[in-house]
Amino acid sequence: MSNMMNKFAEKLQGNDDSHQKGKNAKSSNKERDDMNMDMGMGHDQSEGGMKMGHDQSGTKMNAGRGIANDWKTYENMKK
């Protein structure tokens, strides 16, 4: 899972680099933003996992469906 996120982040940063050649200050700020975004995503995932384990009713299925939707979103953005 983290491998996929790394590739995704690299792709984002690669796109930004091509947009912002020669603007180093802006580029490094953008990279920091991307890192914060990744950390936020990881945080959400672990919280979701805790909720899943906590609540073993129908929530597990919903959480699984949410992950599948995220994967579809990622696949669509990759194109």
From Swiss-Prot:
- Chain residue ranges for the region called Disordered: 1-79
One Gene Ontology term, aspect cellular component? cytoplasm
**What Gene Ontology molecular function terms does this protein carry?**
phospholipid binding
The cysteines covalently paired via disulfide bonds are none
GO annotation (BP), single:
cellular response to water deprivation
Question: Biased composition, Basic and acidic residues: where in the chain?
Answer: 8-20
Say which domain of life the source belongs to: Eukaryota
Beyond the main fields, what else does the record say? Present with 2300 molecules/cell in log phase SD medium.
Name assigned to this protein: Protein SIP18
| Species this protein is from | Saccharomyces cerevisiae (strain ATCC 204508 / S288c)
